[in-house]
């Protein structure tokens, strides 16, 4: 018998949160802890958005995006989630950059990175320190039109190798590149340089289950397999949402209408405007501005599971490798790219498992159009090619690893789009101009807010979590004032 995933929900809530990415989860938790009646809806059968996982036969557990985040994640988790979540965050000390311009092994903290730039790349220490100082002094509200590439050239003129070392890991972290505003680079890079790269010990499955348990403990109603089909607006005010239970086999359940005072959309900001709400509910100028927002790049992953009982040597935690002569966003995002990052998950990732297990995930940046335009036959062939190239590349670090892999599969921008509904399969939300549109939604429609990955600086694990709190704080104040006025 098909299951109605919406069974038992009430007809009205203070806030409905659409989507359970880290921004949605954290925003929902903030609002629930502050006494608001919150309903969180996720269309997928797993919570977490891109911060999720999947299992495969053979005891494999694959993390979608648990590759690394800055130390600021510890502070945010301590502040907005139970202490045990923050206490499970551990440092990844082995990052590697291997390409025709360099072979670097680093802990990716400021001291080590500085020594590499000075000793290996022969950059004056004063110039490196001046660069760091410049990044720290950057302010989001400054009217600074300088691009990241222009900033690199100012401090390290003609040094394409240095530019590559500085830019490539951030391109993987949030999809940005040298033509984006320098502020988007400065904020993110400075966060990483604080104390290095960190991850969650226990895996994404453990993390998200703890977060969902905390949400329920704070009185938040959470439902998965629930697709929000639209936000209802009357007289420029949010009045409710429409949602349908799904993933239930052959039976189709009716659309449910839920009343609410406010909606926190954790969807793509353009999806929110163009599909969830509808363009006709906004001013023409705002719609034009929103449609001009560029979606960020997408990504591919190749998931490789090591057989039970087999081991692999320590080759580093994050291995950035490329055959490209120099850094190029065109090459980095091409369907034929030679650039990818191996995230290696050793037994320490999930120490609670009864047996030591190893997995490797290769991540590649990608362009939506290149993958979306393929026929089904071409699509399958490209996925197979990508898998083979990643295994061959991994063999250069671990000879014979092919024989130790008993599961391999690929995800593409199409996969991201299917499971997250994110426009053009973007893995990192929008380019910088999307942040202004996101922040001004409630100026257009009372009670409508957004906390999805946006503007580059609000992308990635830390950015989206913090943006969830920023937006939820605005909502909390608005709901409080609204209640006082009654």
Can you say where each PLM-predicted feature lies in the sequence?
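N-terminal glycine-rich phosphate/pyrophosphate-binding loop and immediately adjacent elements
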Residues: 2-123
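Rossmann-like flavin
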Residues: 100-184
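A glycine-rich dinucleotide-binding beta-alpha-beta segment and adjacent secondary-structure elements
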Residues: 164-173, 396-458
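Helical element adjacent to the flavin cofactor pocket in flavoenzyme catalytic cores
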Residues: 189-251
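Mid-domain catalytic core of redox enzymes
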Residues: 229-354
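Active-site-proximal substrate-binding core of FAD-dependent oxidoreductases
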Residues: 233, 476-486
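C-terminal segments that line or cap access tunnels to active or ligand-binding sites in enzymes
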Residues: 307-411
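A conserved FAD-binding loop/helix module that cradles the flavin
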Residues: 453-479
């Amino acid at each position: 018998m098909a299951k109605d995933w919406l069974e038992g929900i009430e007809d009205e809530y203070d806030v409905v949160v659409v989507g359970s990415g880290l921004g949605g989860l954290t925003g929902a938790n903030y609002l629930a802890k502050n006494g608001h009646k919150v309903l969180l809806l996720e269309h997928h059968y797993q919570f977490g958005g891109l911060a999720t996982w999947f299992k495969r036969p053979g005891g494999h557990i694959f993390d979608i995006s648990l590759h690394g985040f800055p130390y600021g994640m510890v502070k945010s988790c301590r502040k907005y989630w139970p202490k045990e979540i923050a206490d499970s965050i551990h440092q990844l000390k082995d990052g590697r950059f291997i390409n025709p311009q360099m072979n670097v092994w680093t802990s990716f903290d400021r001291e080590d990175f500085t020594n590499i730039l000075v000793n290996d790349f022969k950059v004056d220490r004063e110039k490196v320190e001046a660069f760091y100082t410049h990044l720290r002094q950057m302010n989001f509200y400054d009217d600074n039109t300088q691009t990241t590439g222009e900033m690199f050239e100012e401090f390290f003129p003609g040094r394409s190798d240095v530019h590559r070392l500085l830019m490539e890991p951030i391109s993987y972290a949030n999809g940005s590149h040298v033509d984006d505003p320098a502020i988007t680079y400065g904020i993110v890079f400075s966060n990483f340089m604080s104390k290095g790269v960190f991850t969650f010990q226990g895996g994404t499955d453990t993390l998200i289950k703890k977060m969902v348990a905390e949400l329920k403990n704070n009185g938040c109603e959470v439902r998965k397999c629930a697709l929000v089909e639209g936000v209802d607006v009357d007289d420029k005010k949010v009045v409710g949402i429409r949602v349908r239970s799904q993933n239930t086999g052959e039976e189709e359940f009716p659309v449910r209408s839920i009343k609410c005072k406010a909606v926190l959309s954790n969807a793509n900001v353009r999806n929110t405007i163009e599909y969830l709400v509808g363009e006709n509910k906004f001013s023409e100028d705002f719609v034009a501005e929103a449609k001009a927002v560029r979606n960020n790049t997408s990504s591919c992953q190749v998931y490789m599971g090591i057989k039970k009982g087999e081991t692999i040597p320590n080759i580093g935690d994050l291995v950035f490798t490329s055959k490209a002569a120099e850094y190029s966003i065109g090459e980095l995002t091409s369907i034929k790219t030679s650039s990818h990052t191996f995230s290696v998950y050793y037994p320490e990732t999930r120490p609670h498992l009864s047996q030591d297990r190893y997995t490797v995930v290769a991540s590649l940046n990608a362009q939506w159009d290149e993958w979306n335009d393929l026929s089904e036959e071409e699509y399958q062939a490209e996925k197979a090619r990508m898998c083979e190239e990643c295994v061959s590349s991994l063999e250069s670090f671990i000879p014979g690893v092919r024989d130790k892999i008993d599961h391999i599969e690929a995800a593409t921008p199409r996969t991201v789009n299917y499971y997250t509904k994110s426009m053009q399969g973007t893995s990192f939300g929008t380019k910088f101009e999307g942040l202004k549109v996101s922040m001004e939604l409630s100026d257009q429609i009372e009670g409508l807010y957004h906390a999805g990955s946006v503007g580059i600086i609000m992308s990635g694990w830390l950015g989206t979590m913090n943006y969830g709190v920023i937006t939820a704080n605005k909502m909390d104040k608005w709901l409080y004032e609204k209640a006082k006025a009654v």
